[in-house]
C-alpha cells in the first residue's frame, strides 16, 4: 500500500518534475491556413463530449482557430501534458486540477464542462461486500491521482471509514478488472468505461455497489501558453458543440463513438452519455467542491499549498466564459 507521504511524492513528482518544463511549449503561431493553432489534451470521452462533437463536426475553423486534439488515458495525464507544454488546454477531472493548484502550478480553470455522479464500487460475490462498511480491512484497487480516487474516499466516508482502514492498491484504470478477476483485490473503483468489461470478465461472480455521493466534474483548464483570445475561441466552439449535443443527443453519441476510434463500445456510450449533465459553467458549487477536495488532499496526501476558498478562487479564470456566455458565470 502506498502511504500518504509516498502518494504525495508520486503526485508532486509528476507535476513538478523537470520533464514537465523541459519539453518545450506547444505551437502558438498560425497554422497552415493562417488560423491560430491551438493544442488541446482531452481525456474522458463522455465528460469531454463537447470537445469530440466539435472535432467530429469540424467546428473549430468557424471560430478562426486550428485545433489539434489528443486523447490521454486519464485527466491526470492530460493535465501533465498542459503543465509540460505539450498542450495549451486540457480536459481534466477536478482532483488533478486541485492537486496542481496545491502544488502552485501555473494553471487556470476556465470552465466546468460536465457533471457525473453515477459511480460503482466493483467487487466479487465471494467477497460478500454488501455495503461500504464491509470494505474495512479489504484490498481496494484504484487509479490514484485521479478523481476516481476521490470517489473512493467519499464511498469510505459514507461508512465513517478512511483510506487508512483499507489497503489501497494503485492500478491503472484498465487493470482494475483483471485484478478483480484474479482475486488480487477485493473491490475496485475505476472509470465507468470499464464497468462492462468487469461484468463480462467476472460473469456470475460480478457484484457492484452504486454510489452517487460524489459529483465528478470535467474541467477545461488553460496552461501558461494559452492566450485569452484562443481560449475564448475554444470555449465559443464548445458552447456550439454543447448546443448540438442538446439538440441531437443521438448524433452526439455517434460523434463521440467515432472519435473514440474503437476505444468505446456503442452500448456503453448509449447507456452512459445521458447520465452526464452538460453545460459550461463557473459556479459557487464548483468552488465549494474544489475547496473540499483540497482539504482532503492536504489531509490524506500531505500536499502543500493553501486549501482555502480565496486561494483556490485565484485559479478560476472567468474571462473567456464571461465573454461567450456571461450568465454561465455565477461564481464571485
Roles of regions detected by a PLM:
Residues 18-22:
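C-terminal motif of bacterial Sec signal peptides marking the signal peptidase cleavage site
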Residues 24-27:
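Bacterial signal peptide processing site
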Residues 29-162, 167-170, 186, 192, ...:
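Short, glycine-/small- and polar/acidic-enriched structural segments
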Residues 95, 168-169, 174-261:
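Pocket-lining segment of extracytoplasmic ligand-binding domains
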Residues 113-123, 204-224, 235-239, 274, ...:
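Periplasmic-binding protein-like
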Residues 227-304:
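Secondary-structure end/capping motifs
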Residues 298-332:
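Conserved C-terminal helix/tail region of periplasmic/extracytoplasmic solute-binding proteins
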